[in-house]
């Protein structure tokens, strides 16, 4: 695995699964506001990111549910080393196709949905 792919895996793992700025910001919101922000994100980003994040969170949470439900469940959840390792492997498949355009849409969606 090259460094760039590893960095992307690490970034996305931190983003979705640990105490990252985005997760902390989401989890600090009231539930109604959090759902509103996540719906905004869904409307303003690439569907590929949502499919990946749903799959990635589903892997960690062992739950097949909506993007919003999975993010709700992820707030406050601690993941074991084995869970993280398994999801690193799953993430690798997606990240090969994580294009610059998708990264830009993701960044813009986060900015638009939080900066209100």
From Swiss-Prot:
Tissue: Expressed by the venom gland.
Gene Ontology terms: cellular component: extracellular region
UniProt entry tagged with the keyword Signal: yes
Signal peptide: 1-19
Keywords assigned by UniProt, alphabetized: Disulfide bond, Secreted, Signal
Domain of life: Eukaryota
Modified how: Contains 3 disulfide bonds.
Subcellular location: Secreted
Record bears the keyword Disulfide bond: yes
Protein name: Venom protein 54.1
């Amino acid at each position: 695995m090259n460094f760039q792919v590893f960095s992307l895996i690490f970034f996305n793992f931190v983003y979705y699964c640990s105490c990252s700025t985005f997760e902390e910001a989401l989890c600090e919101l009231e539930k109604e506001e959090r759902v509103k922000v996540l719906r905004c994100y869904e409307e303003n980003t690439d569907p590929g990111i949502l499919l990946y994040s749903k799959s990635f969170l589903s892997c960690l949470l062992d739950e097949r549910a909506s993007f919003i439900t999975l993010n709700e469940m992820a707030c406050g959840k601690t993941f074991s080393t084995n869970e993280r390792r398994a999801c690193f492997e799953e993430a690798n498949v997606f990240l090969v196709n994580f294009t610059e355009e998708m990264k830009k849409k993701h960044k813009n969606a986060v900015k638009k949905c939080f900066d209100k």
